Amino acid sequence: MMKLQDFDYQLPQSRIAQSPCAKRDHARMMVLDRRIGSLEHRHFYDFPDFVRKGDVLVINDSKVIPARLSGRKETGSRIELLLLSRYSDSPAVPETDSTEWPFFRVGVEETWEALLKPGKRIRIGTSIFFDDHSRATVIERINEKKWLLTFNTALPFDLFLQRYGKAPLPPYIKREKKNAQMPEDRDRYQTIYARSPGSIAAPTAGFHFSEALFKTLRELEIVIAPVTLHVGFGTFTPIETEDVEDHVMEVESFSISPESSDKINSAERVIAVGTTSTRVLESAADEQGRVHPMSGQSRLFIYPGYRFKRVQALLTNFHLPKSSLFLLACAFAGKDRIQQAYATAIQEEYRFYSYGDCMLII
């Protein structure tokens, strides 16, 4: 059994990026050749130097919704909400083929799973009020962390979120209260190719692509294949088991179109942009490595020992220690290679986590 503690590392707080790079494609990029372990220090605008005709770049086009809300209880005390998924028998996905707002139903109550902070004194029936007199009512406790709430809003729910919701920045982005949310977060905590609303955390490896860089890739005849995985609680929830193998991922909704699967299956090399794209590809691939078009749910947990079926190169950010994302990187490049690369990244003062720099593993 693998011990989770073996995937820990110490990161100085100063290395956690608190804001995005001034220009998307100017982030630093470490290039790791997993065969020989060599490292190269570049910038993301150099990414075209590492691709060639015949490559297919697989991107996750899921769009982050403004899922963080602030309200008050009847006592006047403030409470923070992070919406996780619209409630149904399965994780929330749009009920229409539309990839643009609004994708929520209008004229009916909305029921959502959510995290509440502070959550110690929450009871069934607790009401939470918002600035426009809209209200959410707690109707069920799902488990120690998650609650079920019904919203009655003055506006259609998508417009309510646009007006009052904030970008669901991760908790390690710590700013002074007045700058807790900056105007650019709505734009920068999002990829430029986001199309399908539904994520509550961003597929951050895609942050580094600019329109100019995409133009260069197209000129190089690099094929782009979009897939969708709505990033949910399962991606960022901490692993709490001592043994890695005992961890169970929560389900997340994903889809891959016939057009994208055809592009991927004809690729000479598949480059996955991010761990979420990787999980879509590996969930949709058969044992021969052929990717099939499908829509479904995945709880695929990739950790060292996993045999990759379709991904041949990976672009990813620098991840939290002991996280499922870090374990995926270790599975792809090897635990020792990744730990050595991370130690070098700390020494070379790379920026870590969501708004940080990236690593290309070839």
From Swiss-Prot:
One of its GO terms (cellular component) is cytoplasm. SUPFAM superfamilies: QueA-like. Its main location: cytoplasm. Pfam families: Queuosine_synth. Keywords: Cytoplasm, Queuosine biosynthesis, S-adenosyl-L-methionine, Transferase. Its EC number is 2.4.99.17. It is found in: Cytoplasm. NCBIfam families: PRK00147.1, queA. This is S-adenosylmethionine:tRNA ribosyltransferase-isomerase. It comes from Syntrophus aciditrophicus (strain SB).
